[in-house]
Amino acid sequence: MLLGQKSQRYKAEEGLQAQGEAPGLMDVQIPTAEEQKAASSSSTLIMGTLEEVTDSGSPSPPQSPEGASSSLTVTDSTLWSQSDEGSSSNEEEGPSTSPDPAHLESLFREALDEKVAELVRFLLRKYQIKEPVTKAEMLESVIKNYKNHFPDIFSKASECMQVIFGIDVKEVDPAGHSYILVTCLGLSYDGLLGDDQSTPKTGLLIIVLGMILMEGSRAPEEAIWEALSVMGLYDGREHSVYWKLRKLLTQEWVQENYLEYRQAPGSDPVRYEFLWGPRALAETSYVKVLEHVVRVNARVRISYPSLHEEALGEEKGV
C-alpha cells in the first residue's frame, strides 16, 4: 500500500483519538472487495494514460494510436469492454486472413486510453490558466471521433486529475455542461507559484498529510522518506516534477504553513518530525484527508512520480 499497513492506520486512529477527532474516523468508508477490484482496473488505466516529462519541461508531441504502445500500457482487458465475444470465437477458429479481433480490440483500447491522457493534459492546461471548460470544448479539441465514448473517457480523466494532481473537476452548469477545476479538500495551495510551475502539487501534499495521520498525527522524518521512496520519490534526488523534494517538504510547505518540521522532543541523537501546519488544519480535516487516502490506496498501487511524468508527457501537443 502507498501509505502503510493496517498497523499504521491503527496508529492514526490512536493519535486522532488523543486530539478529539476519533468519532469522525468512524465515518471513513473503506472500499469493499468489489470496489477494490474495480479500482484495480482503474489504476491500470491511470498508469496507461501517462508519459514521461523531459527534464527541460518540454513535452513531446502526441502519438498516434498505432504508435501509442510505448506509452500506453494496458494489461486489463476489462478497462474497455469491447469485442470480448469476438476475441474468444476467433481463438476457436483456425488461421484466418481477416484481422485478429483481439488485436483490433487492443488497438481500440489504446486509442481510448490515449484520449484519456490527452484530456488530462487539456484539463491541466485549463487549470493552469484558470479557465472553465465545457463538454463542447472537450469534444471538439480532444475527443473528436470518439464522441460515443465521452462518458468513459471523461470519467477516467477526472479520476486522474483528482487522485494524482489533487484537482477536482466540478460541474457548475448542468444544462450547458460547464465545469471548473479546483483543488481538492478545500486546500488553497497548488504549488504553481513556486520554482516549478508546470504541474499542481496538491496531490502530493495531500498524500504527505495522510502519511502524517498514518503515523499518529506526528510522523518521524525517516518514516516520511521511507514511504515516499516506495512511491519512487527519494531524499536528495532531484525530480523533473518536484525538483528538490526536501526543499518542498521542509521549506516551501513549512513556509506555506501546511507542515511543521521540528526537532522531535527528547530525541537523542537529534531527530526531526513532521506535523500538520495551521493552514492545513484550517482548510481541511483529518477525515477528509483520510477518505482521500483510502481512495488513492484503492486506485493507485503504482509508481507515483511516473503518473505525473506520463500525464504531462505530451502537453504541448494538446
From Swiss-Prot:
Expressed in many tumors of several types, such as melanoma, head and neck squamous cell carcinoma, lung carcinoma and breast carcinoma, but not in normal tissues except for testis and placenta. One of its GO terms (molecular function) is histone deacetylase binding. PROSITE patterns: MAGE. It comes from the Eukaryota. Residues 112-311 form the MAGE domain. Residues 1-103 are annotated as: Disordered. The keyword DNA repair does not apply. One of its GO terms (biological process) is negative regulation of transcription by RNA polymerase II. Not known, though may play a role in embryonal development and tumor transformation or aspects of tumor progression. This is Melanoma-associated antigen 8. It comes from Homo sapiens.
